[in-house]
């Protein structure tokens, strides 16, 4: 197998395994990984417009998250209100229940990050540089870059 082919399948397998593990941990909360990403994005950056939220989501990069948001609004986790400066715009914020679940999601994520940190060796920087270069300019790469910039 070529190195590039092996890398492609390793990235795919790691993404699928990470998503599977996260989905398994989120199941008792009644959340999907995409819904959890919305809650965490709003917890960190609310209020956000639908477009503003969409620009930060890796799970929905390049598309509008309106159906995803509709589902969590219906569950009472997110409030959708007219914008403060433009009544035609919509602002999204977490409800108290959404805030509670977001904190639980954050704790699950921290446990997952601790596992990843324990596995990461001294060359992790090289791996991160490669992955950043690989996704640079893509819709998901731009969404991730925006999230990183906002967190700094």
Residue ranges and their predicted role:
Residues 70-129:
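Charged, amphipathic alpha-helical coiled-coil/dimerization segments
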Residues 20-61:
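N-terminal helix-turn-helix DNA-binding core of bacterial DNA-binding proteins
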Residues 3-7, 61, 120-124:
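Residue-level recognition of alpha-helical structural elements
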Residues 7-10, 14, 68, 101, ...:
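Amphipathic alpha-helix face/heptad-repeat signature
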Residues 1-29, 77, 91-92, 96:
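N-terminal leader segment of winged-helix/HTH proteins
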Residues 14, 18, 57, 101-120, ...:
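Alpha-helical linker/hinge and terminal dimerization helices associated
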Residues 1, 122-152:
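C-terminal regulatory/oligomerization modules of transcriptional regulators
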Residues 64-65:
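Helix-turn-helix DNA-binding helix
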